[in-house]
Amino acid sequence: MSSTTASPVTVAVTGAAGHIGYAALFRIAAGAMLGHTTPVTLRLLELPDAVRAAEGVVMELEDGAFPLLAGTEIYDDPTRAFDGVDVALLIGARPRTKGMERADLLGANAEIFATSGKALNAGASPDVRVLVVGNPANTNALVASAHAPDIPADRFTALTRLDHNRAVAATARHSGVPVTEISRMTIWGNHSPTQYPDIFHAVVGGRSGADYAADTRWLTDDFIPTVARRGTAIIEARGASSAASAANGAIDHIDDWVHGTPDGDWTSVALPSPGAYGVDEGLVCSFPCRSVGGRWEIVEGLDINPFSRARIDASVAELRTERDAVAALGLL
């Protein structure tokens, strides 16, 4: 994925005319995700009643005259959209509406992502990289993978890079250290308010993150809730959910997956647990990860103190509940 003489990389984006898809597509076309020498073909997948909006997005992509954009295609059929695809950003999901119970939301989206999994299984590239952004992202990724038995489970991931970036930014605001000098941050668990942003293993301007965690009031009353509930704060401030920052997190995630994480650093990725850190095998849980040779590897051997253990366990318990709710619907 590094030469302009190579065949274009085919990238499918679901919910492509939505706010996150719109924010992501132009940066992907400009080379921010796969590199500035890698041509891309973009496949925009939308619901039939949103195809017209997707046509408008394609007009804008054409008008950008991006040198790396080899082509754009619009689909309302996931099987056609995912045929031969190399990267799939599964952004489209049903939002929670007034009066909808969480179980109803889980069920509605599980059906959507079961369909996506089947379509990917039918014809995606053998080494496809799948990133689920649509919420509840962890469990949606679990469902999609379950319906794609011919694709290795480790090719399915869910987005916690947005949360990771939020944790880095919150630490930068508190410490006065630039984000470029903050490394080894970790998000554990679910992409939900139960997530656990872990600064204990981070390096902040050459200092141990544990030094900052020693300020327990900041840690428990500011840092953790600010990161975990940042999405809600953004909705309250702008009247709409995170879009540009979510798109940026997705681009960062795929960029690291393709090109590798920086030496001495790691990032946060929700992927199927192999049983690491006591997390049930198969649960799609966020871990500290490095990208090596195009594959994610969980960072092993970190010391988990009792404070962290309790918070990781709480988020994992929520993931179990989500899994069991979807399984009860016959979708796992």
UniProtKB/Swiss-Prot annotation:
InterPro entries, per database record: L-lactate/malate_DH, Lactate/malate_DH_C, Lactate/malate_DH_N, Lactate_DH/Glyco_Ohase_4_C, Malate_DH_type2, NAD(P)-bd_dom_sf
Residues that coordinate or bind NAD(+): G15, A16, A17, G18, H19, I20, G21, N109, V133, G134, N135
Active site: H191
Segment forming the signal sequence: none
Pfam families referenced in this protein's UniProt entry, alphabetically: Ldh_1_C (PF02866), Ldh_1_N (PF00056)
Keywords: NAD, Oxidoreductase, Tricarboxylic acid cycle
Protein name as annotated: Malate dehydrogenase
Organism classification: Bacteria, Bacillati, Actinomycetota, Actinomycetes, Mycobacteriales
Gene it is expressed from: mdh
